[in-house]
């Protein structure tokens, strides 16, 4: 029965995947020369809408990737226990409680999104490399993680331009680090690698949801500041 469920989910994913790609609005802010010059020509309101749409799609695909990974590699008894691995963004100064989120400024909402986005760029590259070593990783999972990784860079570019438009500020940079993912270049054992990759997928899904929620709150504040929750 479990195998049938996995196959059915895979069939639906194959059928819906092209539609998901076709429905996304491009958020490519970068010209060939590496200069952010496309998004600045978009109005602030439209740019925020596109950034939100990107965040929504990234969260949706991260959810699908995590579920697919669970079905393929993680026994039920381990799905709520990630073997003590902490999320890599745990130490970031990002609001977590509802009260904190409601009290922070628009500026800090945007910078929180950017910190989360930038903190995940390199770990997702690592995740792709790790999944490539699996003998049984389905192509759909590999394609989804690659798509999310690419869209995350587009989201970063959009948020950077949004910060400049809304706050008249330059880019906030985060020092990307893979420390704790591959320490001293030593490859983890397969079981450890599977659980570590599962933690990465689960943590990214949570952070992708935060990015989406922060951006939607920001959008709400632009129209009805006193009735946003």
From Swiss-Prot:
Record key words, sorted: Disulfide bond, Glycoprotein, Hormone, Secreted, Signal
Leader sequence residues: 1-24
UniProt cross-references to Pfam families, sorted A to Z: Hormone_1
Any GO CC annotation of this UniProt entry: extracellular space
BP GO annotations: animal organ development; growth hormone receptor signaling pathway; positive regulation of growth; positive regulation of receptor signaling pathway via JAK-STAT; response to nutrient levels
Domain of life: Eukaryota
Glycan-modified residues: 143, 175
Compartmental location: Secreted
Cysteine pairs bridged by disulfides in the record: 29-39, 87-203, 220-228
Keyword match Protein biosynthesis: no
PROSITE patterns on file: SOMATOTROPIN_1, SOMATOTROPIN_2
Example of a GO MF term: growth hormone activity
UniProt keyword annotation of Isomerase present: no
Listed InterPro entries: 4_helix_cytokine-like_core, Somatotropin/Prolactin, Somatotropin_CS
Protein family (similarity comment): Belongs to the somatotropin/prolactin family.
UniProt name for this protein: Somatolactin
Originating organism: Cyclopterus lumpus (Lumpsucker)
